[in-house]
């Protein structure tokens, strides 16, 4: 479903940071300021968000993987929830350096986590001593928190969706190094450089974060649904062609 200007206003997408903290590279997206707070121009944000959704829709239709990244307290739960709804991987605890540029190491940790989860399911942990079980529980909890969201990613994603580029500059840098497209929310205190699909907007409000994440997840689900419909229609077309020539 398309996001409207009214929804953006209600979510506070237009509220930037204090004027003294601004990044001049965001000047083209700033409408003005009120009470020493920059006001983002939603007439710029809305079409740019729509473009980002269009790209995401196409990527999802081609079975692409989009990694959701949002580790700030106010975005953690929403990022996990919307990524899961869209069937996409996510990082919502801490970005571990090398998550993309050193994917081989991440794969080792993922294997360890999956082996541990399998041990729990098979009842293997019941044979452990109290101390062993406690250490096991601590390790599996730590792994689930840090990499649980990417355990089924399978490889480097086709794009990343980031809320707050300043807070996640390592993730953006890694994506840039690998040529992975970056879709990101950029507030008035950060630079849009290194971002392929810039969404100028408030990156602190939980309502605004929910609007972005839901919009991206919706676009993914729409892209997948469109791809399925095309396959069904193509199959029907083939059947009709066979009938005509029978």
From Swiss-Prot:
CDD domains: RPS2
Secretion signal span: none
Record bears the keyword Metal-binding: no
Protein family (similarity comment): Belongs to the universal ribosomal protein uS2 family.
Cross-referenced HAMAP family: Ribosomal_uS2_B (MF_00291_B)
Keywords: Ribonucleoprotein, Ribosomal protein
Keyword set includes RNA-binding: no
Source organism: Burkholderia cenocepacia (strain HI2424)
Gene: rpsB
PROSITE patterns to which the protein is assigned, alphabetical: RIBOSOMAL_S2_1 (PS00962)
Name of the protein this chain belongs to: Small ribosomal subunit protein uS2
GO terms assigned for molecular function: structural constituent of ribosome
GO terms under cellular component: cytosolic small ribosomal subunit
Listed GO biological process terms: translation
Pfam families, per database record: Ribosomal_S2
